[in-house]
């Protein structure tokens, strides 16, 4: 079995429906990167006061996004938890519909880890790196904007569930055919952070910093 837990609260704050779909899709990507196929999920919904119309809308749209995502990956929600009224005098927390998804690895030989294995191996990027129509080139709702520019703004990446499902199926096929030694999903921090994380091996951690240029 494999387990993934994901949610980008900033993306959900800016677009609850797309952000919630993306949380499900990221779980499925992480499972695929481990060599697993999704079989079920559970949620942990953390929101503010639902009597506030805007916050209730966040909850409603998030649940709609989770439902579409789980249906797309055939990962039914078997249970969950809801926590409301999460706020202080300054306002409510960012809506955080955290998803946990479990997957099945049919053959132990297909268990896949994230780090690079051998010098000279080819690095392949599956999927489009950024939406060509995005004026912020993928930076909408990013930690870059929030930390360096103190802005919670922009349009987070759109989540095409059909594309995500195809990506997962393709990756699993590559893993099961023995063509992939390691896999890691590209999420918070973008490609640079993903590549850096792929350098961290539990076996050779002391040697990996030299790979980071």
Per-region residue spans from a language model:
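Glycine/proline-enriched, intrinsically flexible loops and inter-domain linkers
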Residues: 1-213
């Amino acid at each position: 079995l494999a387990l993934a837990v994901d949610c980008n609260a900033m993306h959900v704050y800016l677009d609850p429906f797309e952000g919630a779909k993306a949380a499900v899709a990221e779980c499925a990507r992480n499972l695929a990167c481990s060599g697993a196929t999704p079989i079920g999920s559970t949620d942990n919904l953390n929101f503010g006061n639902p009597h506030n119309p805007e916050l209730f809308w966040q909850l409603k749209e998030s649940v709609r996004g989770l439902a579409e995502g789980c249906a797309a990956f055939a990962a039914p929600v078997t249970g969950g938890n809801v926590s409301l009224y999460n706020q202080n005098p300054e306002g409510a927390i960012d809506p955080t519909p955290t998803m946990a998804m479990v997957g099945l690895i049919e053959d132990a030989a297909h268990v896949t880890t994230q780090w690079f294995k051998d010098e000279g191996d080819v690095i392949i990027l599956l999927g489009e790196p950024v939406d060509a129509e995005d004026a912020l080139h993928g930076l909408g709702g990013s930690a870059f904007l929030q930390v360096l520019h103190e802005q919670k703004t922009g349009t987070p990446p759109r989540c095409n569930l059909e594309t995500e499902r195809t990506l997962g199926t393709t990756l699993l096929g590559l893993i099961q055919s023995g063509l992939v030694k390691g896999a890691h999903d590209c999420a918070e921090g973008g490609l640079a952070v993903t590549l850096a994380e792929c350098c961290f091996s539990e076996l050779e951690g002391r040697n990996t910093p030299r790979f980071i240029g």
